[in-house]
């Protein structure tokens, strides 16, 4: 009963939250403070655009590095790509300065760490009280990698990958991306190549499934199907 009563107030709470203006710079102006409500669709359309701009400014202030923790990191690149900022998402993904996904790799990481600096070549190991070297949280970036970089997404209206959304976002310094996902119906494969003259995209879906393909082009007449 308590849960049911709480849910009845959810739309009103969402409306109240969404109509509140995002705070100006310097007042609770963190990356996560914008990422989470943007991901869950809590802002109205006017304030959504303001929140996106505030988020971009917050990222710029940190010199295109992450200031998010376990709550904001999983949604950061998803929010950027869902709102058309794929290049910024790729910039964060390829960042090597601290704190970033690739910074630990340059320090010798072969797993996901609990901290961005669990170990550094210069300073050695971080505090033992919070320093797991096998910690999933920051590895949540793989959802963005599958959904937008590789371009394989589930259709929530047809669960189980009966219908598949293929939506590759070509960007960053990459010239080639390939990946697959094994569904209950079989393997979905998606890959793209980028050259100076053209983009090439290939996909394979299992038998007895369908897919909708979204390509990042502005002129459909330039799309050639093979």
Residue ranges and their predicted role:
Residues 87-226:
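Non-catalytic C-terminal accessory modules of carbohydrate-active enzymes
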Residues 1-125:
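Catalytic cores of carbohydrate-active enzymes
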């Amino acid at each position: 009963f308590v849960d049911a009563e709480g849910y009845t107030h959810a739309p009103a709470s969402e409306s109240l939250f969404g109509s509140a203006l995002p705070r100006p710079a310097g007042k609770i102006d963190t990356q996560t403070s914008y990422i989470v409500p943007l991901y869950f669709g809590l802002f109205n359309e006017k304030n959504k655009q303001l929140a996106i701009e505030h988020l971009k400014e917050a990222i710029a202030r940190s010199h295109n590095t992450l200031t998010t923790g376990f709550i904001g990191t999983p949604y950061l690149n998803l929010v950027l790509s869902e709102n058309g900022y794929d290049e910024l998402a790729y910039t964060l993904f390829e960042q090597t300065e601290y704190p970033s996904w690739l910074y630990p790799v340059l320090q010798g990481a072969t797993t996901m760490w609990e901290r961005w600096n669990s170990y550094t070549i210069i300073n050695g190991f971080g505090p033992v009280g919070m320093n797991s070297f096998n910690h999933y949280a920051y590895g949540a970036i793989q959802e963005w990698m599958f959904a937008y970089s590789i371009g394989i997404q589930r259709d929530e209206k047809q669960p189980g990958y009966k219908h598949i959304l293929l939506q590759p976002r070509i960007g960053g310094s990459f010239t080639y991306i390939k990946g697959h996902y094994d569904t209950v119906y079989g393997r979905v494969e998606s890959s793209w190549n980028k050259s100076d003259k053209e983009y090439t995209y290939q996909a394979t879906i299992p038998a007895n499934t369908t897919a909708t393909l979204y390509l990042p082009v502005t002129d459909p007449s330039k799309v050639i199907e093979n």
